[in-house]
Regions:
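Bacterial N-terminal signal peptides that target proteins for export
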Residues: 2-9
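Catalytic cores of secreted/periplasmic lytic hydrolases that degrade extracellular macromolecules
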Residues: 2, 20-191
Length: 191
């Protein structure tokens, strides 16, 4: 009888443990997928990481990321998280400055090469999303190219997951893990 109660207890405990684990939504790894977060979700997460940022600007950028990513078939959660990684949550520094509207370091190759500048936030976001699409898939762009460096990514589709961006998009071998870390924090804050 004691053995039976023990087994029932262990079964109940394991059921509780595994059912609690299933509530956490795992972050996406495939770049060519659909984002889950709303502009408000992205904004709230971002502000928790950089409370001094301009909330209106962050919300605008979040909405642009959702719209442009949806158009090009790229995961907006991944693109937005990559912007957070590349800009230090809009703290910038290094070769890219805020007024450049360059949210992913496009063209900043070191040796003093500052990188691309874009006329508006929306154009800068579109260029980022299109550049990310070049790494994720060989499918053609939906919108006319805003990314002047799109043509240099060859072969197209060489990094379909966030982990493939390590050593391709960025030299850092831990780049994919850093991006996953931001996505995990985002999803834990939302789900």
């Amino acid at each position: 009888m004691r053995k039976r109660i023990f087994y029932i207890f262990i079964f109940g405990l394991s059921f509780l443990f595994f059912s609690c684990l299933s509530f956490f939504v795992r972050p996406p790894h495939l770049i060519e997928s659909r984002g889950r977060c709303s502009a408000e979700d992205l904004t709230v997460f971002f502000m928790s990481q950089n409370p001094k940022a301009d909330r209106a600007k962050v919300k605008r950028l979040a909405q642009f990321y959702i719209e442009e990513s949806e158009t090009e078939g790229i995961n907006s959660d991944i693109a937005f998280s990559q912007m957070c990684l590349e800009t230090g949550f809009l703290r910038f520094g290094g070769l890219v400055s805020e007024e450049m509207n360059n949210f992913c370091g496009l063209g900043s190759l070191g040796d003093g090469k500052k990188g691309e500048s874009f006329p508006s936030e929306k154009t800068g976001v579109l260029a980022h999303v299109q550049h990310l699409k070049a790494y994720a898939t060989a499918k053609p762009l939906v919108r006319p190219p805003a990314d002047p460096r799109y043509k240099y990514v060859n072969p197209k589709g060489k990094a379909p997951t966030i982990y493939g961006l390590a050593g391709t998009w960025a030299a850092d071998p831990n780049y994919g893990k850093k991006l996953e870390n931001i996505l995990t924090r985002l999803y834990k804050s939302v789900y």
